[in-house]
Amino acid sequence: MTKLIYLIGPSGAGKDSLLRAIRQLPLPRLLVAHRYITRPAEIQGENHIALTPEEFAIRQQLGIFALDWQAHQCHYGIGIEIDYWLQRGSYVIVNGSRAYLTQARERYGNTLFPICLTVSESALRQRLRARGRESEQQIATRLQRAEDEQSRLQSDCILLNNDGDLQRTLSTFQSLLPFDRACAAHRE
């Protein structure tokens, strides 16, 4: 049975770095889905498709998103193509939303495999400051939100710590996947 790996975690936890590393793994049946976001594309940030709010709304009305939500004054969407990828036997990983986990669970049921990337408060503060996108007040708000969301995670959400070396996190990620050997065995 294929799985939709729903990677969540606070801004600054390292989801984008982990997703870039996952793309390099020799697992051809593990597909990383991009997101549609109403913010400009970034050179070093997430590989996403930038849309205006109007473009996003049109796609939303057309049912082009399998999942969509709003956070931090932006709209986020995951394309409906992930459903096709799952039907074709691929495993799919998406950069999800902690606040939208319940809705994702309702849509995907047992296919959903939630993984929460965690970091210590000090590491998160340092990363948010280093990227320079948020004010000190916004950083404080994000830190509080990270703590609040962490306390509300359901017990089936697997925790993956990313305080240290990315390669160690990647290795732990691979060990969490109950299907990575089967996924690798289907190389074409």
Curated annotation (Swiss-Prot):
What is the catalytic activity of this protein?
alpha-D-ribose 1,5-bisphosphate + ATP = 5-phospho-alpha-D-ribose 1-diphosphate + ADP
Please provide the Gene Ontology terms (biological process) for this protein.
Answer: 5-phosphoribose 1-diphosphate biosynthetic process; organic phosphonate metabolic process
**Pathway in which the depicted protein is active:** Metabolic intermediate biosynthesis; 5-phospho-alpha-D-ribose 1-diphosphate biosynthesis; 5-phospho-alpha-D-ribose 1-diphosphate from D-ribose 5-phosphate (route II): step 3/3
Q: Name one GO cellular component term.
A: cytosol
Print the keywords alphabetically: ATP-binding, Nucleotide-binding, Transferase
User: Which GO molecular-function terms appear in the entry?
Assistant: ATP binding; ribose 1,5-bisphosphate phosphokinase activity
Instruction: Give the enzyme class.
Output: transferase
Q: Which PROSITE patterns does this one have?
A: GUANYLATE_KINASE_2
Q: State where ATP binds.
A: G9, P10, S11, G12, A13, G14, K15, D16
Give EC number(s), comma-separated: 2.7.4.23
The Swiss-Prot or TrEMBL record describes its family as follows: Belongs to the ribose 1,5-bisphosphokinase family.
Q: Give the protein's function.
A: Catalyzes the phosphorylation of ribose 1,5-bisphosphate to 5-phospho-D-ribosyl alpha-1-diphosphate (PRPP).
- Which HAMAP family does this entry report, sorted A to Z? PhnN (MF_00836)
Q: Which PANTHER family match?
A: GUANYLATE KINASE-RELATED, RIBOSE 1,5-BISPHOSPHATE PHOSPHOKINASE PHNN
Q: What is this protein called?
A: Ribose 1,5-bisphosphate phosphokinase PhnN
UniProt source species: Pectobacterium atrosepticum (strain SCRI 1043 / ATCC BAA-672) (Erwinia carotovora subsp. atroseptica)
Instruction: Identify the taxonomic lineage of the organism of origin.
Output: Bacteria, Pseudomonadati, Pseudomonadota, Gammaproteobacteria, Enterobacterales
